[in-house]
Amino acid sequence: MATEPKKAAAQNSPEDEGLLIVKIEEEEFIHGQDTCLQRSELLKQELCRQLFRQFCYQDSPGPREALSRLRELCCQWLKPEIHTKEQILELLVLEQFLTILPGDLQAWVHEHYPESGEEAVTILEDLERGTDEAVLQVQAHEHGQEIFQKKVSPPGPALNVKLQPVETKAHFDSSEPQLLWDCDNESENSRSMPKLEIFEKIESQRIISGRISGYISEASGESQDICKSAGRVKRQWEKESGESQRLSSAQDEGFGKILTHKNTVRGEIISHDGCERRLNLNSNEFTHQKSCKHGTCDQSFKWNSDFINHQIIYAGEKNHQYGKSFKSPKLAKHAAVFSGDKTHQCNECGKAFRHSSKLARHQRIHTGERCYECNECGKSFAESSDLTRHRRIHTGERPFGCKECGRAFNLNSHLIRHQRIHTREKPYECSECGKTFRVSSHLIRHFRIHTGEKPYECSECGRAFSQSSNLSQHQRIHMRENLLM
């Protein structure tokens, strides 16, 4: 008698598939919530770190108060009551690693919220691989000669610096146009300038025309070395009448006339006439008084680098017509970085990602790789954040406390779910009847009333139920029958 219902239930494969889809969607939704919460925690951690590093002695009334405040800020950042010694060590190593990176690379890595030094290295390696094929060309501005390799022989001391796009066989680490100093020296006692090396760094895999790194040394009678900051992007400076210099863009029409700076060399601050921007050479940062505005679409940007990126996207495939920095096929690949194309695709399920590090993390789902192991019980996890949450089971730690009732939780998502009891918030609404719920799982359970889905089946008689609690209650009937027999 019991075999016939089992055969009938086995034929309901569409229902089983529907159940599987519902479970997968529920897991993806919960995973998405955990990802947002994790990113929020990383942002909070970074804020605490900056408060600790930027604390000044003048902010406290005395030395004892200063020490106490520093200790408090350090605990807020490293959270020794939550993190293990290994995790605290990893945070310190990661901070120092980001500190020694150039400023542009720091910004790029920070945007991806790395949790460990290994993740930061993976992000940088991904960035290098994506920009290895950029081909650049430098042309002499006045003589029309193409200059390859990394040296220039200037004719005189009045510095007349010109910027041109370059195409060279040398290997570069960025998709940014290479910049070359073209120095004119008119002094009789001048000697040939030293070799000038062309370097470039990357800011969020963007073409940086607005951020200037390094220090500019003045020429006073005799030629001096004007390339003092090795490993940084060199920018074009044009000295007019011995009073001002002008910084211009490498591609007038492709990028638009973005930057035409009239600079004062005497001070540390350089002002921009068009948008009243101010550049601090020492801090390598722009402090805007106004936003740069794109003339075609009227969109404004706070940072010049964002403005340039917008110009690139807006120009699209037209960029290759105005300069020799990129040829058409390479331009398409280069522009894909800014357009948000997901070029890294999973061979198993076809899901695409923008960065190879995210793809590598995703592929652990298919391979079953679990590289993070618990020292207490030996259980392994695919994500470091999962291991951190698991360790709280052993430590009994519940760092997330409710301010209303004092109840504590080991996960922030559980605290958020609990707080809806106090706020009476019900964000999950049924599209069929409009009924709302505090938890997404309650909405999924309720939705089975409308769909008629009964995913929980009794192994004894084949009867199906919409809720697992009803199945458990039903199975007690069979248990009693077995005891009586």
UniProtKB/Swiss-Prot annotation:
Query: Could you say which residue ranges form the zinc fingers (C2H2-type)?
Result: 290-314, 344-366, 372-394, 400-422, 428-450, 456-478
Domain SCAN box residues, every copy: 62-127
Where does the protein end up? Nucleus
Which PROSITE patterns does the UniProt record give? SCAN_BOX (PS50804), ZINC_FINGER_C2H2_1 (PS00028), ZINC_FINGER_C2H2_2 (PS50157)
Gene Ontology BP annotations: regulation of transcription by RNA polymerase II
Which domain of life does the UniProt lineage start with?
Answer: Eukaryota
An annotated GO cellular component of this protein is: nucleus
Name of the protein in its database record: Zinc finger protein 165
**Organism in which the protein naturally occurs:** Homo sapiens
